[in-house]
Swiss-Prot record:
Encoding gene (name): glmU
Residues the record lists as binding UDP-N-acetyl-alpha-D-glucosamine: 8-11, 22, 72, 77-78, 139, 154, 227, 332, 350, 365, 376
Compartment(s) where it occurs, according to its Swiss-Prot or TrEMBL record: Cytoplasm
Region (Pyrophosphorylase): 1-229
Subunit (UniProt): Homotrimer.
Pathway connected to this protein: Nucleotide-sugar biosynthesis; UDP-N-acetyl-alpha-D-glucosamine biosynthesis; N-acetyl-alpha-D-glucosamine 1-phosphate from alpha-D-glucosamine 6-phosphate (route II): step 2/2; Nucleotide-sugar biosynthesis; UDP-N-acetyl-alpha-D-glucosamine biosynthesis; UDP-N-acetyl-alpha-D-glucosamine from N-acetyl-alpha-D-glucosamine 1-phosphate: step 1/1; Bacterial outer membrane biogenesis; LPS lipid A biosynthesis
Enzyme class: transferase
Needed cofactors: Mg(2+)
Lineage: Bacteria, Bacillati, Bacillota, Bacilli, Bacillales
One GO term (biological process): regulation of cell shape
Name the record gives this protein: Bifunctional protein GlmU
Gene3D superfamilies in UniProt: Hexapeptide repeat proteins, Spore Coat Polysaccharide Biosynthesis Protein SpsA, Chain A
């Protein structure tokens, strides 16, 4: 049986009070629409259609060709939004899942279970429900004396008694596709908001003695919609808690989960320790037995095993096993550190390969460079890589020693076992096994201040 999905993402989100389209706000390092689309696709969907309106181009740019798109010019309600997908799905057979684009906490497992329940019961429609402590704003699930669904009533149309019901509609549904588009033609806007409600499709199915099921989730957080900045913060908090708990169950020690921010796509190996105030984001991969020190930020980077990082910023970099980083080091895009490399305090590395065993202990800038194995770069040493127009490369061979306060003016190559005297400004290549000294001879005038 074919499975389709429609993601509703046409609302402007005025309560967010933002120039940014609502579903493009981030939760746990990814936009809400990406979270929803990823989980929908992973639930076994063959075809995804996203309904766009305000900010359509931005949504298309975010999801790319992973989805088809239908445009809703006027926002006339959820049934009207779903109807826009008829250009892609009206002739299709099978099951169609309808999900709101502002529900980033919905899981693949719940969506799979919803669809399976729907298909196993040969239902024409199934609604995902939950129990809310505060159901205000949600449609209420109305059942008869035998517990069967009677209808879903929206907040503004509910009586006082109906508003006391705490079983709510999530706004997530599974439908028989042909029945869905047949009934959408019959939906009217006779309600307080003069909108075309998708839940009215369920009432129309029931009128024809069709089968409508309710699938209940015990986790209200999953179906929580995000309509303003407060709810965005709540979603972030819930997502962070979920992510951190999963890592801890997988063998990662997180000292203070409340202050630890780990993105949804980050992977961490067993017995790694994450200290308070750490932020790990993007597609970062952390190995085993590594210590990520407090207030470290790692983005889209690969960190090996048995690495120690103290209070540093690492972005789009690679760090091999047994390396030590920081405190207060910065690895910028293109930094590639080999095994047992040391990058100390106030060292910045950009677009450079630092080979195994090399040491950059403190106060250095290494840019557009290649540092050989076991080479030591002294305090205050700089690769002078930019002439105001172009960047140039510095190459330092293996087992070399760069004295303190040295300037290496690129393009330049220092051979293996080079020895550069402290305080030198080196502008010419240095052959291997050579000493280079480029500084003025010291002049001392004794008794000068007594004159």
């Amino acid at each position: 049986m074919q499975r389709h999905a429609i993601v509703l993402a046409a609302g402007k989100g005025t309560r967010m009070k933002s120039k940014k389209y609502k579903v493009l706000h981030d939760v746990a390092g990814k936009t809400m629409i990406e979270h929803v689309a990823d989980n929908v696709k992973q639930s076994g969907i063959d075809q995804l259609v996203t309904i766009v309106g305000h900010g359509a181009d931005s949504v298309k740019e975010t999801l790319g060709d992973t989805s088809l798109y239908s445009f809703q010019e006027e926002q006339l309600g959820t049934a009207h939004a779903v109807k826009m997908a008829s250009e892609h799905l009206s002739e299709s057979q099978g099951t169609t899942l309808v999900v709101c684009g502002d529900t980033p906490l919905i899981t693949t497992a719940t969506l799979k279970s919803l669809v399976e329940h729907h298909e196993n019961n040969q239902a024409h429609a199934t609604v995902l429900s939950a129990t809310a402590e505060n159901p205000f704003g949600y449609g209420r699930i109305l059942r008869d004396s035998e517990g069967r669904l009677v209808s879903i009533v929206e907040q503004k149309d509910a009586t006082d008694a109906e508003q006391q019901i705490n079983e709510i509609s999530s706004g997530i549904f599974a439908f028989d596709n042909q029945v869905l588009f047949e009934k959408l033609e019959l939906v009217k806007n006779d309600n307080a908001q003069s909108e075309y409600y998708l839940p009215d499709v369920l009432s129309l199915i029931l009128e024809d003695r069709g089968i409508v099921e309710v699938f209940h989730t015990n986790d209200f957080e999953e179906i929580m919609g995000v309509n303003d900045r407060v709810m965005l913060s709540e979603a972030e908090k819930a997502f962070r808690k979920r992510i951190n708990e999963q890592h801890m169950k997988n063998g990662v020690t997180i000292i203070d989960p409340v202050t630890t921010y780990i993105g949804a796509d980050v992977r961490i190996g067993e017995d790694t320790v994450v200290e308070p105030g750490v932020k790990l984001s993007g597609n970062s991969v952390i190995g085993e037995d590594t210590v990520i020190g407090q207030h470290t930020e790692i983005t889209n980077s690969k960190i090996g095993s048995n690495v120690t990082i103290k209070q540093s910023v690492i972005n789009e970099a690679i760090v091999d096993d047994y390396a030590t980083i920081g405190p207060f080091a910065q690895l910028r895009p293109g930094a590639d550190l080999g095994k047992k490399v040391k990058v100390g305090n106030f060292v910045e590395v950009k677009k450079s390969v630092v080979k195994a065993g090399a040491k950059l202990p403190h106060l250095s800038y290494i840019g557009d460079a290649e540092i050989g194995e076991r080479t030591n770069v002294g305090c205050g040493s700089i690769t002078v890589n930019y002439d105001g127009i172009n960047k140039f490369k510095t190459v330092i061979g293996d087992d070399s020693f760069i004295g303190c306060n040295t300037n290496l003016v690129a393009p330049i190559t220092l051979g293996n076992r080079s020895f550069i005297a402290a305080g030198s400004t080196i502008t010419d290549n240095v052959p291997e096994d050579s000493l280079a000294l480029a500084r003025a001879r010291q002049t001392t005038k004794e008794g000068y201040l007594k004159k």
